[in-house]
Design a protein with these regions (language model features):
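Extended recognition/assembly regions associated with phosphoester-bond processing machinery
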Residues: 1-172
Length: 172
């Protein structure tokens, strides 16, 4: 499944009017859309000149979530993207930026792998302008907390849509 685009969850989209499925690397004017990379496609992506590149990249030294950094596999790296003004990628849950690369992140935290990572929401990009990020202030939040801290600061810690993993550090 990692070496093919034959089976994917978005395939149903081709039957919806107004949606175009991009299943091959596609350039339209100054925009390049890159589906899941297979084979040696990663070798040509960084050299493709464009203003905007959108992809589903697994770049080393970026965090997949709030705790786990993507290891270097010896393939595509952030430093390979020298011919693009902006590179936007999905795939990783954490919103983050390095140089011209923007990982958009998920619109909301999903589980305890996203502890303390509240910069979630959406991004709007108007062609020719800077991307604008919006945080969803009322998104679900995940926290790890000691019971003693929770008891001392209950009102500060417990908020709407707060998921708490409580560690027992005192006798109950």
């Amino acid at each position: 499944y990692k070496d093919s685009r034959d089976v994917q969850s978005t395939e149903f989209g081709r039957f919806i009017p107004g949606i175009t499925m991009v299943n091959e690397i596609t350039k339209i004017d100054d925009v390049v859309m890159v589906p899941w990379l297979v084979g040696n496609e990663w070798k040509k992506v960084g050299k493709m000149k464009c203003k905007y590149m959108f992809g589903h990249f697994e770049l080393p030294n970026f965090f997949m979530n709030a705790m786990v950094e993507m290891p270097d596999t010896g393939e595509l790296k952030g430093s390979d993207f020298v011919a693009q003004e902006y590179v936007f990628s999905g795939h990783f849950h954490k919103r983050q930026f390095k140089n011209n690369i923007h990982y958009l992140g998920n619109p909301f935290p999903h589980n305890y792998a996203d502890v303390d990572d509240d910069e979630r929401g959406m991004m709007i990009l108007e062609h020719g302008k800077e991307p604008v990020y919006f945080n969803w202030g009322n998104c679900p939040k995940y926290r790890n907390v000691k019971l003693s801290t929770l008891l001392d600061k209950t009102k500060e810690i417990m908020k709407s849509k707060m998921h708490l993993r409580v560690t027992l550090d005192i006798d109950i």
